[in-house]
Curated annotation (Swiss-Prot):
Modification comment: Binds 2 heme C groups per subunit.
Protein's gene: napB
Assembly information from the UniProt record: Component of the periplasmic nitrate reductase NapAB complex composed of NapA and NapB.
Binding locations of heme c 2: 111, 130, 133-134
A biological process term (GO) from this entry: anaerobic respiration
Record function comment: Electron transfer subunit of the periplasmic nitrate reductase complex NapAB. Receives electrons from the membrane-anchored tetraheme c-type NapC protein and transfers these to NapA subunit, thus allowing electron flow between membrane and periplasm. Essential for periplasmic nitrate reduction with nitrate as the terminal electron acceptor.
Name under which the protein is recorded: Periplasmic nitrate reductase, electron transfer subunit
Assigned protein family: Belongs to the NapB family.
Lineage: Bacteria, Pseudomonadati, Pseudomonadota, Alphaproteobacteria, Hyphomicrobiales
GO terms for MF: metal ion binding
């Protein structure tokens, strides 16, 4: 009878022991690994103070845009500006009729268009909340390295231009 062959029984025991040892070794190695830290912040269960607020850039100098159709950034303080359904403090300077007296740049004519491209007498409701697209700038260091290249740096360079 085959099932009573002692060498076969020994072989089955060896394979079982080998499988158990393999599971034990792999399980301990998997449990011993630590999860890599993606940031230097403490564990979420610890109470920590908030980082200080960044210093806003409020030099009133218009910044160059980084790409076509980028909304201009806000070069002045908007602290305390009321922006609600009933009031928009930005319009007191940037509305088309008031820019001559305020010296502020006029908002784009696209802000007076509805979704169908029809011109309106007043700012389109979908463009009324300025800070949805336009943001003030803060004096901070980048969170990640930036390898951005301006479009002019990516364009064609004639042979022999030395660049």
């Amino acid at each position: 009878m085959r099932s009573q062959d002692p060498s076969r029984r020994l072989s089955r025991r060896l394979w079982t022991l080998f499988a158990l040892a393999l599971c034990l070794v792999t399980g301990t190695v998997a449990l011993a690994q630590t999860v890599p830290q993606l940031s230097g912040r403490p564990s979420p269960m610890q109470n920590t103070g908030a980082d200080p607020l960044p210093r806003w850039i409020v030099d009133d100098i218009q910044k160059m845009r980084n790409y076509p159709d980028q909304p201009p950034v806000i070069p002045h303080s908007i602290e305390g500006y009321q922006l609600s359904v009933n009031t928009n403090r930005c319009m007191s300077c940037h509305r088309r009729e008031l820019t001559e007296g305020s010296g502020a740049p006029m908002i784009s004519v696209t802000h007076y268009m509805n979704r169908e491209g029809q011109m309106l007498a007043d700012v389109s409701p979908r463009r009324y909340f300025c800070t949805a697209c336009h943001v003030p700038q803060a004096d901070t260091r980048p969170l990640v390295d930036n390898t951005f290249k301006d479009m002019s740096e990516l364009g064609f360079k004639p042979a022999g231009s030395g660049q």
